[in-house]
Amino acid sequence: MNNIMIGRFVPGDSWIHRLDPRTKMIGTFIFIFVMLWSTLWATYAWSAAFVVLAIRLTKQPFRLYWDGLKPIFWLILFTVVLQLFFTPGTPVLLHAGPLKVTIPGIINAIYVMIRFVLIILMSTILTLTTPPTSIANALESLLKPLKKIHVPVAELSLMLSIALRFVPLLMDETQKIMNAQKSRGMSFSTGGPIKRAKAIVPLLIPLFVGALQRALDLANAMEVRGFQDATQRTKYRVLSYGSNDRSAFIGLIGFTIIFIGIKFFIK
Amino acid sequence: MAINFEQVNFSYGAGTTLAQPILHDINVTIPDGQVTAIIGQTGSGKSTFIQHLNGLLKPTTGRVVIDDFVLTSDLKEKNLTSLRARVGMVFQFPENQLFANTVLEDVMYAPINFGYAKADAEFAAKTALKQVNVSEELWDKSPFELSGGQMRRVAMAGTLASNPDIIVLDEPAAGLDPKGQKELLAIVRGLKEAGKLVVFISHQMDHVIAVADHVIVMHDGGVVAEGTPVEIFNKDLVWFKTVALDLPKAGQFAEQLRQKGHILRHRPLLLTELATMLNEEKRHE
Amino acid sequence: MVKAIKIDNLKYSYDERSLFSDFNLDIDAGQWVALVGHNGSGKSTLAKLILGLLVAEQGDIDVFDERLTVETVHHVRSKIGMVFQNPDNQFVGATVADDVAFGLENIQVESSEMPQKIDNALTIVGMQEFKNREPHTLSGGQKQRVALASVLALQPKIIILDEATAMLDPDGRATVMETLQKLKKQFGKELTLVTITHDMDEATLADRVVVINDGQKILDGTPAEVFSQRKALHENGLELPFANELAFHLNEKPNKYMDERELIQWLSTLNK
């Protein structure tokens, strides 16, 4: 029921699950950055192999990763089609006005698709193995240096974790309000576009009002429990790197070195 | 004009890998012109059950027949409007559904959606507001300026305004103080007197014994008992434990007396009954 | 006798209507006071005034001899814990443990000391097995017990429960009340408890009942004293607890105030 989480987290005990969330975030960024330099089938293959290894290490069925790709399917298709029909070059296979199917076009299309898929898969590894609040904690820790330029990292991070905690509740409430208004005859499926747009008001207003009331109540509760300055707080969940993280970083460096090696040697 | 559940089964996400069966083999009739209470512990399927009464949910297999309207799994959303005009549903904490600029506008929302002309909708709204004792001076105010109790009554009026024959209420007394609870029960009785078919979910057995004519007991997604409140509340205690329900307060009190060796002639369900029985004992001594 | 809370000449208006005018209330340390009134009587507003969430126009509020002012408000709050009515709107953490930790983080407890304090607080309310659960998997009663634990972890001298059971089902209400009774027994005079409610069966548990309507004190005394005023209670939108209403209807009544347990005992011995 209502399991549409933003990047669904699945609890588990794999090596990847146990990594520090910062390691996973940094790893995802590094992988994507490096992978985007890929121009040869060999580097794509190497990147794909790395992702497959990572997926195996999460000990989760591939079906879950496939589910992560499904929402992006149309976007991938759209980009692939663009590459397919609009890449200049020779030899040309089909020609119809501005549309041109060329061999370089086909190759580019395949490469674009692989890039998309690998990026999504890698991000899914992150969200599948890391609870949202750990991601928020990791972000707070990684963005700490920004405090020097007066970015309110502590406040933003607290806002993020509280907001995340309310996601399931807000989804439930949306369903309840929709049920209440549907019961009073609200319909999204009839009428012209203007009527349908107006139909959203009886859904949005109660949600907003509810959210505002919740914010007020929460603020009171937080104050009463001693909240004053977001920057003057200790932390219950302290992140610390372990030996697993060291191995993970070594693995990442290894991936990058071999990637660069392939690029230079197969040229 | 009764409601019939015929071999109804319901699962969330039926047909997918995440299917969650909730209701099993429901065969039950909700009688016309009476107040029926649906009771059962949290998770017994009561909310899922009542959402079949106005088509918010459709049976996965089986059918729900509401008067002459047949609800099956393949019915399209657009065909449900006529059902919802006849079955009004008041959810728990209904004040959360208020949205309009004025009280009157909010209460007119349902009638207008169901095709009333503006003047008729206004009249219907005013009638409904009077029915739930929301005074005229509040009609032009923003619903958000009202007290919690007033907001709840406005929300109820919002459902009554389309003049449904069947009214369903999910825990209508939740969060109300004693006075508010009394007023709520009076409204329910008023609906019955007006000839409506009323269904309500409640955790408060004292309310059930006060207004219900008929009781349906749910447990683990199925209907395990049906009858008048007196019949249900006279079942043995072991049964009550298995379905995780309580007796009305008077019954609980009498049970505690019985455990101390003071046994009454029969199980009282109302405070006045209990007092009368205790007084009669004294006279026989 | 040390006064836990002392309210003098309180004046407060809401929406241009006067709610409290010259309101006085003293609560002794270690007392369990039930503040009762129908919805809208002003009882919740009083709680917010005591905690400085609302500011009175006139009057003084002292908490354990410390005057509540703009400067002292944070220190005063450190002596009081409050559990609010809506179980979801006070649950800050992503899990039960995180929520209890929230208060500890605010007062800058060392990270290494937190797990123990969290465990202790959760054990008192019987929720330690739910430590890693997310709030949307908990019932209302469970969430309120977590709220109590979050408050207990800060070791307040006073706990105020503002209609903490109003949104719960009978089961949830019962578990919260059981937990409160256990708490009061465990901490005795060290804990001052103020329960704000409109449920008279809950009010029976207190040492003292204060009835409020329209910002005015209507009745103030022991449960025995207050529940003998059936007419006054009805006039103020309240009812008697079940046992007392029953006793009222009996031809042969007990000669003194009895709560439910005592009445059952009395009735059962009569029959033997």
UniProtKB/Swiss-Prot annotation, chain B:
Pfam families per UniProt: ABC_tran
Q: Which Gene3D superfamilies match?
A: P-loop containing nucleotide triphosphate hydrolases
**Which gene is annotated as encoding this protein in its UniProt record?**
ecfA2
What NCBIfam families does the entry give?
ECF_ATPase_2 (TIGR04521)
Active site annotated at which positions?
171 (proton acceptor)
Q: What cellular-component terms does GO give this entry?
A: ATP-binding cassette (ABC) transporter complex
**PANTHER family, sorted:** ENERGY-COUPLING FACTOR TRANSPORTER ATP-BINDING PROTEIN ECFA2 (PTHR43553:SF27), HEAVY METAL TRANSPORTER (PTHR43553)
Its name, as the record gives it, is Energy-coupling factor transporter ATP-binding protein EcfA2
Chief location bin: membrane
Instruction: Tell where it localizes.
Output: Cell membrane
The reply to whether Cell membrane figures as a keyword in the UniProt entry is: yes
Query: What organism is recorded for this protein?
Result: Leuconostoc mesenteroides subsp. mesenteroides (strain ATCC 8293 / DSM 20343 / BCRC 11652 / CCM 1803 / JCM 6124 / NCDO 523 / NBRC 100496 / NCIMB 8023 / NCTC 12954 / NRRL B-1118 / 37Y)
From Swiss-Prot, chain C:
Protein's job: ATP-binding (A) component of a common energy-coupling factor (ECF) ABC-transporter complex. Unlike classic ABC transporters this ECF transporter provides the energy necessary to transport a number of different substrates including 5-formyltetrahydrofolate, pantothenate and riboflavin. Expression of the complex plus FolT in E.coli allows 5-formyltetrahydrofolate uptake; 5-formyltetrahydrofolate is not taken up in the absence of FolT or the EcfA1A2T complex.
Tell me which NCBIfam families the record gives: ECF_ATPase_1, PRK13648.1
The protein, known as: Energy-coupling factor transporter ATP-binding protein EcfA1
Outline the extent of the ABC transporter domain.
5-239
Q: Does the keyword Protease apply?
A: no
**Cited InterPro entries:** AAA+_ATPase (IPR003593), ABC_transporter-like_ATP-bd (IPR003439), ABC_transporter-like_CS (IPR017871), ABC_transpr_CbiO/EcfA_su (IPR015856), ECF_ABC_transporter_ATP-bd (IPR050095), EcfA_1 (IPR030947), P-loop_NTPase (IPR027417)
What molecular function does GO assign, one term? Answer: ATP hydrolysis activity
Q: Where in the cell is it found?
A: Cell membrane
Question: How the protein assembles, per its UniProt entry?
Answer: Forms a stable energy-coupling factor (ECF) transporter complex probably composed of 2 membrane-embedded substrate-binding proteins (S component), 2 ATP-binding proteins (A component) and 2 transmembrane proteins (T component). This complex interacts with a number of substrate-specific components, including FolT, PanT and RibU for 5-formyltetrahydrofolate, pantothenate and riboflavin respectively.
Query: Per its UniProt record, what Gene3D superfamilies does this chain match?
Result: P-loop containing nucleotide triphosphate hydrolases
Which N-terminal stretch is annotated as signal sequence?
Answer: none
Example GO CC term: the record gives: ATP-binding cassette (ABC) transporter complex
Highest taxon of the lineage: Bacteria
What broad taxonomic lineage does this protein's source fall under? Bacteria, Bacillati, Bacillota, Bacilli, Lactobacillales
